[in-house]
């Protein structure tokens, strides 16, 4: 039997944003000092680098340890909404870049204005399910609801043209199963997959542009996402032989993933080389 015939088929529609993701350089650039950020990107533009997709990171929403997801108001210490709106216009209208926010519907902090325990998934012991540090895992079904509710508000405020939707493709669907018997699809990974897939489609609709995510388990979502970090840390690619057939024959036709991300995504469990 031919090896490639055994590869699973990803039954998602191809991305309709490959003309952007495939022709532009992608960069995650978390908000710091907005005037300094503008000088940095103006210098990039001055050097002739024009086809660029820039997605902000969670620092656009927080100044310290406050909530960074399920937000419609940006970090006050960075100038708040007025500064974020002006920066969005500078990146897109002045420089001609594709620019958008960080968002995430997988991590939810108790200090968030929308917080309620009824939004949080339950584990098999019926306890609140933990997620990222200081966060709990939102119910996938409710995550869809809030994506559909909040994304248009942010788009009306800031006029983005892309977004980074963190974590959704980093975790496996079976790692975020909601065991709350009150929800449809309780105890099933399918409920997670369909919810996260719908979130990606809602993202594209909201920004009228490509949506990116974190990768590692992105094969399930390619096509629904337009790009991801092309990483597979659990395989430990710095230590094991590369079998690229699945990536090239199944994933590449659906979306445009980028590189290996940060070097520690490639050197997942071994020290990075200090010289070349």
Language model regions located:
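Carbohydrate-recognition beta-sandwich/jelly-roll modules
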Residues: 1-66, 72-78, 90-99, 103-105, ...
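The substrate-binding groove and active-site-proximal loops of carbohydrate-active enzymes
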Residues: 19-34, 66-81, 129-148, 178-192
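Generic structural signal for well-ordered alpha-helices
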Residues: 37-42, 84-89, 147, 151, ...
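Active-site-proximal helices and loops of the catalytic beta/alpha 8
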Residues: 57, 88-90, 97-100, 192-235, ...
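Substrate-binding cleft/loops of secretory-pathway carbohydrate-active enzymes
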Residues: 64-68, 108-122, 172-177, 212-265
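Active-site-adjacent "subsite" loops/lids of carbohydrate-active enzymes
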Residues: 89, 97-154, 240-249, 255-258
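Active-site clefts of carbohydrate-active enzymes
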Residues: 130-132, 169-182, 222-223, 267-270, ...
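Active-site neighborhood of glycoside hydrolase catalytic domains
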Residues: 139-214, 219
């Amino acid at each position: 039997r031919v090896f490639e015939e055994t590869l699973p088929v990803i039954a998602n529609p191809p991305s309709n944003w490959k003309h952007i993701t495939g022709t532009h350089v992608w960069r995650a650039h978390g908000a710091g000092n907005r005037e300094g950020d503008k000088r940095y990107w103006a210098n990039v533009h001055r050097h002739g680098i024009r086809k660029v997709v820039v997605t902000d990171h969670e620092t656009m929403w927080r100044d310290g340890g406050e909530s960074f997801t399920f937000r419609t108001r940006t970090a006050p210490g960075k100038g708040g909404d007025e500064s974020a709106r002006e920066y969005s216009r500078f990146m897109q209208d002045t420089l001609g870049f594709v620019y958008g926010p960080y968002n995430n519907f997988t991590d939810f902090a108790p200090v968030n204005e929308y917080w309620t325990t009824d939004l949080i998934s339950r584990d098999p012991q019926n306890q609140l399910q933990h997620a990222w540090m200081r966060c709990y895992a939102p119910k996938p079904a409710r995550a869809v609801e809030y994506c559909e509710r909040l994304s248009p508000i942010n788009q009306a405020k800031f006029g983005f043209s892309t977004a980074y939707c963190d974590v959704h493709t980093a975790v496996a669907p079976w790692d975020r199963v909601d065991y709350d018997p009150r929800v449809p699809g309780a105890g099933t990974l399918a409920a997670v997959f369909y919810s996260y897939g719908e979130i990606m489609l809602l993202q594209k609709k909201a920004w009228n542009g490509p949506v990116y995510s974190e990768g590692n388990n992105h094969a399930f979502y390619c096509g629904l996402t337009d790009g991801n970090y092309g990483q597979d840390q659990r395989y430990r690619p710095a230590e094991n032989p590369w079998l690229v057939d699945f990536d090239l024959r199944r994933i590449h036709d659906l979306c445009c993933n980028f590189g290996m991300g940060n070097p520690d995504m490639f050197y997942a469990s071994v020290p990075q080389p200090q010289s070349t």
